[in-house]
Amino acid sequence: MKLVVGRKIWPPSRSRGMLPDHHTPATWALPGLYVVGGWVVVFVLLVLLSRPALGDGPEIAAADAQPAFEQVERWVRAGAVPVDRLKAPMTGVFGVQVILRDEGELIGRGSALHQDVADAIDQLGPEVDLNGLLAIATRSALEDAQDKLKRRAINLDLGRPELFELLLQEFYSRALVDVQIGYGLTSVLLPPAAADDAIFGQFAPGYHGLRMTGPLAPEADLLWPSAILARNTSPRSQLRQLLDRQGYNIEDLPLIARQGGPQLQRFQVYHIVRASQFQPARPLVRGNLALNQPLIDSRTLDGLVERIARHLEQKTLPAPQRDERLVRGPYHPSYNKVDPELAEPRQVALMCYAMMLHCERQFARDPNNEKNRQRAELVAQVIRRYADTALPGLEQNNHLTTAFMLMALNHGPVTVDIALRDDLAKAVLAMRHPEGGFRAVAGQDTRLSRATAAVLTAALAGQAIESNNPAYARAAWLGLAELFRVNQDDPKLVDLVWVSTALGRAGDRLAAASDDPDAVAKLAGYRAFLSEQTELLIDQQIKAAPLLGPDDVVGGFLLSPAPAGSPPNPTWQSAMPLAIVALSLQDPGIIEPDRVHGPILALGLGARFINQLLLTRTNGYYLRDLAMADGGVRNTLWDNTLYLDCSSMSLIALTQFQSALDELNRRDRASDE
């Protein structure tokens, strides 16, 4: 009983608070002397004396990581670890991992743990020679690399000793070093009544490493964050691996961190990587370069938009037919693989809309920009290649393809295929059901989903502006009325993205073309509703560092429920509320001029989060094909899969942010005249 009291007085790792003076171990149990007396005090003191003594070395800190990295890199360049070396006594460290890569490919890996790792759980632990651990891990990584390169040399008929030695020396000179120093080993404990999946709320994927022990295996197993990110290992797969190694299976997931089951600890790392020979070694947080500024400025925003647009541009490839282009499917950086080989037509159509929206905004700023014109022409070639998939008459579900392709053709600085645009517009108009909604199949009563109806309505609104045809305006207005009616009671994020798009592009024109005598009043009501929803979305944005996990989530939006206390896990879908806020900011009927500062702040934070999702050379230290990945928006901060939708929706949101800033600047200039 009194031992528990003593342990409570001793805070765990520094992630939970300041540690007391560890030079006098007995002081942390002194409060027990005031609670009990006699033999219980003697018992407590005996327990304390039986615990391993804490060292006198300094506690590991972020500043220690860079010298450690430089030490390892010198050893790697020399191809050997010296026997005689200085010691670096530290407390708080329990282990290290060293990885050697060549152009993103893992060539060698080594780890080293202190023999008393268990004594570092929930406390600083004993003194450790950091250089000693680094030496063991580096030597192991070099041996691993030598074995792998030896096998490769034999396959290439370069196995003769003198040739192999040259191969090794060349590798040592260019090897990219990745060093992780583990600290803050913290127990994960779940109450018996916790939900079966509660364990997923106890660690931030890709930021925390994991260690598991259990009664079925003699040794603990660890997963290090850098390797987790490089392999694109999901949280569930991480736990599955640990369970398998401990003699369990995935069905035993509810046993983790409970009495009698496998025990779990999470830990943090100081992570230093040299991502390329031409870059300095940098500290990374969750494999990412930590952004110091809370917001991004307009120049950084422009650069971010350009990188995403360039990434989408390189997703295209020549088609067999002249003046047409295909689009690659999702890229999986961890496997250096495109799978499936080609994107779905719906994904391609959304990309075309995003790119044309971007090109249109660039053209408005600089009509003579030749690079922008060429980019728009490239998108037009993609549209020509996929036009048949967007036209009616095919068996596949092509409603969204038709709508997004129409929206793409109604933007952009190049001459479009008017006949194709009109055919697509007629196809969308024909989907309208006379009793409301949109038909799934011509001549049948089956209605399309709300989300699809919202996209079709946005497409009709755009066509109403471009064609000046009242039939499209009336159909778009009816679609808006239906969508606002259902969203009043049950708002859906996807609906609001495209409703905002339709209203922002053509709201006043649609109301004017309507036969509804209450159209103006309804339009005001729609804007008031979007104003309210915009505020609610901003309230769901992460604006400060979480209690558990890093601050790379700041700017993202919490769009799904999670267990209390769990680290936030925003995804690329944060681009959707970002687009809604940006569209609302462009309309003074939704966000009044004296209320723009909050939304601008939210947009700046949101753009910062999208920037954190971006794959670059720095956070893509494991990339084997940078050109395929650079500028792509990841699925999440721990899932590097580059789906086309992630980058397309992010480009739409950020382009609307740029347009919102353009509109605010226009208002400022107008007020000065």
Each model region followed by its residue ranges:
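Well-ordered alpha-helical scaffold segments within catalytic/enzyme domains
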Residues: 287-298, 349-369, 403-417, 455-468, ...
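Bacterial N-terminal signal peptides
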Residues: 36-48
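N-terminal secretory signal peptides that target proteins for export/translocation
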Residues: 1-32
